[in-house]
Amino acid sequence: MDWIQTAGAGTQLPENNIKIAVFGIGGAGNNIIDDMLRMHPELQTANVQFFALNTDLQHLKTKRYVQNKAVIQFEESKGLGVGGDPQKGAVLAHHFLEQFHKLSDSFDFCILVAGFGKGTGTGATPVFSKFLSNKGVLNLSIVSYPAMCEGLKAREKAAKGLERLNQATDSFMLFRNDRCTDGIYQLANVAIVKTIKNIIELINLPLQQNIDFEDIRSFFKKPAQRLENEANLFRVTNTFTFSFDAHNTIEHFSHKLKNFEYEGFFDHKVEGAQKVILKVLVNQGLYPLDLTQIQEIIWAKIDNHNLEVQLGVDFTDANPSVQLFFLMEKKQAVSSDFIQKPAFISVKEVNQKPAKPFQVLNDLKELGLKYVKQQTGFNY
């Protein structure tokens, strides 16, 4: 065990050695992990490691920033991929389990990132997740669901993959590719990278009113015993962030949270959520926050009197902010609404006759470009 000296006290305390692994599985997962290390190389430390796993050696070689790479292969497969077949992806993953055990053995928390709808991510992710769960390792999966333009076959593969994943993982987040416009999947990478970064910092950066690792485990962990009517429910999580300043007030926070389902990329409404992690960073000199008012806005949105809350509070020199993680149990892996109108479109527009497909795409394109401008500062 490692120890640190406490100044002036003459005592020693053990260091926080919680180890986190982030595995990008398949092409989409590899892309996200590589983007993450390009944008945030400081996140990789002795206790936080990133891995790219793929059946396609050619694609794996194109990743420049992730150093830990492994080919999911077995004899005759030769790193040539699986041709979009999830069954082949699962078979190769089973053959790879001994190596996966060596890669994942020392970690306390594993995040699996993949695109669903093709072969490697859809087939291998549930296999790796089940392996981790059987070992008692906390694991969260962050996966994407194909847009309609990617074809119904891809959606069928993804839906079956989600059913297998739900039986294996502790919980999962679902990103909807149909929320991207004109196939701008870089938006997906930005959103998922931010989410992973927030989770890592939630675990590794202590707060004045702290959220410890056991709090996080109890939030994400699937109960050992579930009632019969709960066994097939999908345990999905979602995340929300908001930073306050002179132009982003408590009223804007309330509006954004109320319209959360229309403005984000992750699937599922949060009404009726069972659990919430609420992390608040306070700077009262820059922008005073009323924590009670913030909580009341959240309670009104979720509308569940049995809500379990883990609250963490700390001080910051930057703009104050709120981070929320929700956990819900749903009957469906993917919410039934396909594409909804953005919240800022007027009621008059909504009441008009249904939009033609190209009109919907143009609306979504406008929404996506506004998001890119907001996130990057670039003007299109």
Curated annotation (Swiss-Prot):
Role: Essential cell division protein that forms a contractile ring structure (Z ring) at the future cell division site. The regulation of the ring assembly controls the timing and the location of cell division. One of the functions of the FtsZ ring is to recruit other cell division proteins to the septum to produce a new cell wall between the dividing cells. Binds GTP and shows GTPase activity.
Binding positions (GTP): 27-31, 119-121, 150, 189
Annotated HAMAP family: FtsZ (MF_00909)
Protein name in the entry: Cell division protein FtsZ
GO molecular function, a single term: GTP binding
Main location: cytoplasm
Gene name, Swiss-Prot/TrEMBL: ftsZ
GO biological process: division septum assembly; FtsZ-dependent cytokinesis; protein polymerization
GO cellular component: cell division site; cytoplasm
Source superkingdom: Bacteria
Organism: Mycoplasma pneumoniae (strain ATCC 29342 / M129 / Subtype 1)
